[in-house]
């Protein structure tokens, strides 16, 4: 939605080879996404890689008496991903090649208090990719789920900024290597694998006690 920022990135990217296209759209709008995808395919003469990076954070508004906050997270992070990527699949099938990428999260493995909508949205897109993978492989279409921890971007706000973070530039360079390497699901940074291991082995009672002590209010 932030056209000015897109145009600034496009201007900086002119220093590199290739042609830059910028479009403004709402990923919750399936019709807009389809129109833009078809426009890009026509202008770029195909599609090699589509990355669904648009997303939002925030807490569930658990005690607000309304589902508007959690619904916005779910609609953006799940429906936004399918809206963004599915219009490209027929062309990739026709080409018999392509790569689809979703930005999941370490939160898809760790149930964070007050952030059930965010965590479940990231589980959902990871599971969607896992289910798509066998069907798309026969058309040489790769599916890559990247599960980052805290990355230093504007989406990370409030108490969440007290956690160790990786710079956006460093993360972006790593993501490129992950995509080129054809990884299926990749947790980054790798030290989060230990946290995921603890979630799996700790008794639920102990895990919930730790979560209540660490996260007694929303972190973002």
Residue map of PLM features:
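Rossmann-fold cofactor-recognition segment
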Residues: 13-31
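Substrate-binding pocket helix/loop in short-chain dehydrogenase/reductase
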Residues: 61-74
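Active-site helix of classical SDR
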Residues: 85, 121
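C-terminal helical subdomain
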Residues: 145, 160-196
């Amino acid at each position: 939605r932030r056209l000015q920022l897109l145009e600034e990135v496009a201007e900086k990217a002119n220093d590199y080879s290739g042609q830059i296209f910028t479009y403004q759209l709402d990923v919750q709008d399936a019709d807009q996404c389809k129109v833009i995808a078809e426009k890009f395919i026509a202008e770029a003469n195909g599609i090699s890689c589509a990355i669904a990076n648009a997303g939002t954070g925030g807490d569930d508004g658990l005690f607000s008496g309304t589902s508007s906050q959690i619904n916005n997270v779910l609609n953006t992070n799940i429906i936004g991903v399918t809206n963004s990527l599915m219009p490209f699949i027929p062309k990739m099938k026709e080409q018999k090649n392509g790569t689809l990428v979703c930005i999941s999260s370490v939160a898809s493995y760790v149930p964070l208090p007050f952030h059930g909508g965010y965590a479940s949205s990231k589980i959902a897109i990871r599971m969607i990719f896992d289910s798509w993978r066998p069907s798309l492989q026969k058309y040489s279409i790769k599916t890559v789920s990247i599960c980052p921890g805290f990355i230093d971007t504007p989406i990370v706000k409030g108490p969440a900024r007290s956690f160790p973070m990786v710079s956006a530039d460093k993360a972006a360079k790593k993501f490129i290597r992950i995509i080129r390497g054809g990884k299926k699901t990749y947790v980054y940074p790798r030290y989060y694998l230990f946290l995921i291991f603890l979630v799996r082995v700790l008794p639920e009672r102990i895990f919930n006690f730790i979560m209540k002590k660490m996260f007694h209010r929303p972190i973002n």
